[in-house]
Every structure is written in structure tokens, then in C-alpha cells.
Amino acid sequence: MRSDMIKKGFDKAPHRSLLKATGLKDEDFDKPFIAICNSFIEIIPGHKHLNEFGKLVKEAVRAAGMVPFEFNTIGVDDGIAMGHIGMRYSLPSREIIADSVETVVNAHWFDGMICIPNCDKITPGMMMAALRINIPTVFVSGGPMAAGKTSKGDVVDLSSVFEGVGAYQSGKISEEELKDIEDHGCPSCGSCSGMFTANSMNCLCEVLGLALPGNGSILAIDPRREELIKQAAEKLKILIERDIKPRDIVTEEAIDDAFALDMAMGGSTNTVLHTLALAQEAGLDYDMNRIDAVSRRVPHLCKVSPASNWHMEDIDRAGGISAILKEMSRKEGVLHLDRITATGQTLRENIAHAEIKDKEVIHSLENPHSEEGGLRILKGNLAKDGAVIKSGATEVIRFEGPCVIFNSQDEALAGIMLGKVKKGDVVIIRYEGPRGGPGMPEMLAPTSAIAGMGLGADVALLTDGRFSGASRGISVGHISPEAAAGGTIALLEQGDIVCIDVEERLLEVRVSDEELDKRKKEWKRPEPKVKTGWLGRYAQMVTSANTGAVLKIPNFD
């Protein structure tokens, strides 16, 4: 066993003595040592219940004949960090999480790992670590939150609250109505109830094969989560016995399938960023062109909030992720069904008995929302290395208009609230990319303000930053190269005409190459917004969004 490094031989007597101080007995040294990587954090509603959840995981690991050791990672709640400097720490926290898990697990030579993530950057951070460490691993997340209901009976979620702010600002609802939405938008523990980033990544974790069937959709408050925990411990023991590791599971074909599910469900645009980062950790050469190819062959079968009033509890009721995958598998060439997963079985075996129980929630191949996926990769002179749009969250397929430019999210939000943006405009928020932000902050507050003011179908928003999974409308993010790297978005001037063509996958500015070259020669890179601390270091090391915004190791040669 890998853990023999710290527990076997006469020279490991000091190690065993220390381990006995934690409560271990002599008989425990013949069992696998399992890292329980938890993320219990009281300020994050999706993680508040994970302290008790972790205890259940440890009990299940002991029952399976292994020895659990629990530790915690950090985390950032994107909703609470939204709209202020705290959001700059969200994406960088993914790297800290990955590094901290690597540190604890490799320093102590664990034989296997169970990861307990749930929200925002915590799931992808742990997934990156699992691929980097490459020991047998199973993920079991905390589960989605239930949707809420206002006193009037309206179904609401976190995106409803953000959009309520814009609606109140524009006089569409009263302060009492906003308070009603606020009080009922997040009614329980769990990851926010729509197809936002947390739930998108937990669903992708399931199809990648790192988590068990049901992981993405069973609610946090559902007793079936406890059964999932027991199964996770039992399956981990099998993975250890068969020496099946994350890099055996997360192949190019698995990533294809993850993006295929993402396209079928119209998941968060953040999944592109995180899954590209996973490919980097797995040593795979996977780029945005391959994502676009997946998008072209996968129909859009589900619309989940913010694209509709359906939530994760409805997906679960309708058959869960397995039912979606089973329906997708009917179309030849969409999924790779014979690859291994954390169950110890193939994807084909995992979904064999699944079925759609509500075809209003999960559409059939014969009745898709669209013939192509709910996420699309756009390219053009404004995004030579690519950009991402959640096409499933807008009915608009082509938009052209003059740009209104803001050099930060704060500047943009103030401008939107002051009425500087009107119908037909293209809002540009730049210098908010991985390096320029730094940290590539999410733009939920501006998109929600636009939607709340009733302009969601009449105003486009383009940025080198990111969007929350709760964003909707004509929102194009991840524009690469970013402004801080001298990308075309940095060269735009007020009133330039920008064209977004979702059908043709184009993102263009109606300015000649000669004029753009002239502007590039005159452009000067702004001073970094942050020069010290973690964000200062991050800005110096982070790469572009089109490669997952991973950190690069400095070359000292």
C-alpha cells in the first residue's frame, strides 16, 4: 500500500507513535489510509451541513474496512463575494484548494481519497488535485439546494434575488416584494438550486466518472445522500483493489462526454474554464475547438434555471443525470459509453436502467430545445482565441450594436444603474480577465441589473471576465486574449459596432485590421490593480481563459 511509507518497518516507529496519538490501533496499520477531503465552511450555505456529512463519510469508510482521516479546504461563496473586491479571490481560490489538497495528501501518503465539495470553485479545485495526485478517488458532493417559494407561491432562487435588485431599482417591484424574494430565495442548505456553476460541475463530475450516479441531482436534504455516501466508500475500496486512478477515468473521451452533458443541459459557462483546467492537470491536449465540435453534435435537451423555472429537484424527479445520458446515448457518436468510471463499471452499465420520467423537464431527442448544444464557442477578430456564450439562456441568435465601454465591473454597474445603457447597446466590461481582474470576477450583478430592468433581450454584455451560472441573456464571456494581454477588447472605442452571431459562432468588431493595428501600437498596458499578496502573485502567474486560467510555473533559465 502507498501508506506503507509512513507505517511499515522498524524505522517508522516514530510515525506510528504519532499516528497512535490520533487514536489508531496496531490493527489499523494493515488497512488502507483514506483522506477525507472536506470543505465544511459555515458562511457558505452549500457547505454548512458538511461537518455532519463528513462524519457520515468517515463512518462509511470505517465500515468498509479502511481508516479515514478528515481535513478541510478553504472556500469562497461566489454569491456573497459578488459585486465587490471579494470576487477577485474566487477563481484564485481554486488554485489554493488544489494545492492544499495536494499538500496534505502527498505529505501523508494516503492510499485513496473521498472528496466532499459542493459549491463554486471548490469542486473543480478538488478535481484538479485528484488528477494531480492520481490516487483512487471518489467524489460525493453536498447536494443541491431546494428551490424556494415566495408568499405568493412564485418559485424563486438566488438568481431571482439578484434580478429582484434590478427590478426594484427600476421601479418594477416594491421594497416589500424584494424582501419577500430575499427571504425565500435560498430556503435550505445545498448548492444554489439552478443550473449554476456549482450544480453544473457536480453534474459534470458524475458524467466524467469521478462521482457516482445521483451525485449531481439528489438534494442536500434528501436521505438518499446518505446511501450515496455508503456506496462511495464501498466503491473506493474496489478502486483501490483494482488500482483505478483518476487519470484512468478522466480521458479525452470522458471530457468529451462531460461537455456533451453540459451542452445538453445548457450548463454554466464556467464549466468551460474548469474543464479545460482539468485537462491540463490530466496532461491532455484539449482545446476550445474540440468543445465547439461537441456543441455541434449534441442537442439541447434541458432548460434549467436561469433558462427556465425548472430546478435541480425537477431534474432529479425526471430521472436525474443518468436519464439525460441515456437519452443522449440514443444518438450515435454523442457519448463514449465503454469507458471506466468510479463505480468500477462502464458508463453504459451505469445508465442501463435509467429512463426519463418527465419529458417536460428532460426533452427527448425528437423534441430538443435546439439541435445544437446550450453552450457555444465564438471566435472572430474580437476573440481570436475564443469566447463563450450560454446560448441556451437567450433566444437571441444575432445582435449588433454600438459598444458602451467600461474598464471595470464597478464602473459598469454604476453606469447601468444611472441609465447610461439603452436598448440596442453592447456593454463592454474589460480589464476583468484572469490577469487584469485579477481573478476573472463574475459579472452576475451587471447581467442581473440589465435583466431586472427589462433589457435582457435588448442589451448584450461582453467581457474578458466570467459570468455566474445564474447569468442569462446575451452574455459573452472569457474573451481571449484578455484586455490586460493586449487583446482586441482592449482596443475598442466608444461607439464601435460589435456583432454577435450565435448561429455562425462569430464575435466581430466592425473595424478594419489596419485601424486595429494602429490602435494596438498606441495601446499601453495599465498598471496592475493589485501588486502584493496572493492576488499580486496570481496576476503574474495566471494564463489565459482559453487554457483554463491555470497557473504557469516561471521559467528561471
UniProtKB/Swiss-Prot annotation:
Cofactor annotation remark: Binds 1 [2Fe-2S] cluster per subunit. This cluster acts as a Lewis acid cofactor.
Protease keyword on record: no
One protein family per Pfam: ILV_EDD_C
Catalytic function, reaction form: (2R)-2,3-dihydroxy-3-methylbutanoate = 3-methyl-2-oxobutanoate + H2O; (2R,3R)-2,3-dihydroxy-3-methylpentanoate = (S)-3-methyl-2-oxopentanoate + H2O
GO cellular component: cytosol
Keyword rRNA processing: no
Residues carrying N6-carboxylysine: K121
Designated name of the protein: Dihydroxy-acid dehydratase
Organism the protein comes from: Bacillus cereus (strain AH820)
Lineage, highest ranks first: Bacteria, Bacillati, Bacillota, Bacilli, Bacillales
